[in-house]
Structure formats: C-alpha cells, structure tokens
C-alpha cells in the first residue's frame, strides 16, 4: 500500500491540524504496517509530513519513507538531504519530460501509484491544487486535512 501527499508549499499549521495528520497516519499504519510513503520534499506540508512520519517510524519501523525525485540529475541538491532523511530515493520514469514540467509529472506519477492521497489544500490555485484535481479525476481516495 502506498500513501502520498499534496499540499501548499507555504502555510502555517495549527496544533489541531498537526494532530489530525498524526492521528490519520497512525490509523492508516495500523491497518497496514508495511505502508510506503511517497514524499516530494517540497514546501511546508511535505516537511510536516516527513517530520511526523519520522517520529512515527520509531514505533512503526516497517513503514518506508521514500523521496520521489523529479530530476535524475545527480547534482540535484535535495538528493543529498534525501539520503539522510528518507529510506530510499525513487526516480520515476520522467526521462523524456522537459525540466519545467518535471515536478508536475512527478506529482501525477505519485498520485497514480498511490492508494491514498493525504492533502492540505485550502484554495483552488497552484501546483498542489492541480495535483488534488488530478487525484480526483483518477478517482483516488483522498483525505484533505485542511477541511
């Protein structure tokens, strides 16, 4: 089972929203302790998800935290960070995608692979909102913790 995330890159979270995310993740992990979590590593919501999952990994060691990179470039700065904060790095099949579309196509790939999309979407514009709309078109199970 795979869970992925989409959320606004710049936002502040209430303690209630942070706890809501944590409790949702615990509930899902208890259903299937071998979940894989696909994370994009961009913005505030991705950072919150990574921090929460790393905290939960102390109790649920079987979960995998996977950084899904939009770029194959070995000099991509986030790859070095990913080596220390994720269990592995995945390069989706994006070799033929122009660099300016790589993040969008990576997000779509993550949605296609996922069984559940956990979102933090408060408004209808931007890349995160586009990813959420894509997940809806693909009829993915979605939980938006911003509501």
Q: What are the residue ranges of the model-derived segments?
A:
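Acidic/glycine-enriched connector segments
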Residues: 1-147
């Amino acid at each position: 089972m795979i869970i992925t995330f989409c959320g606004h890159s710049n936002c502040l979270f209430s303690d209630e929203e942070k706890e809501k995310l944590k409790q949702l993740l615990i509930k899902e992990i208890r259903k299937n302790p071998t979940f894989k979590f696909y994370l994009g590593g961009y913005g505030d919501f991705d950072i919150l998800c990574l921090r929460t999952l790393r905290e939960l990994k102390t109790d649920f060691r079987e979960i995998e935290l996977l950084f899904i990179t939009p770029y194959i470039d070995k000099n991509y700065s986030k790859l070095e960070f990913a080596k220390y904060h994720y269990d592995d790095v995945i390069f989706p099949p994006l070799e033929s995608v122009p660099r300016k579309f790589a993040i969008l196509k990576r997000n779509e790939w993550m949605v296609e692979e996922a069984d559940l999309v956990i979102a933090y979407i408060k408004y209808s514009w931007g890349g995160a909102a586009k990813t959420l709309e894509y997940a809806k078109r693909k009829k993915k199970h979605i939980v938006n913790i911003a509501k």
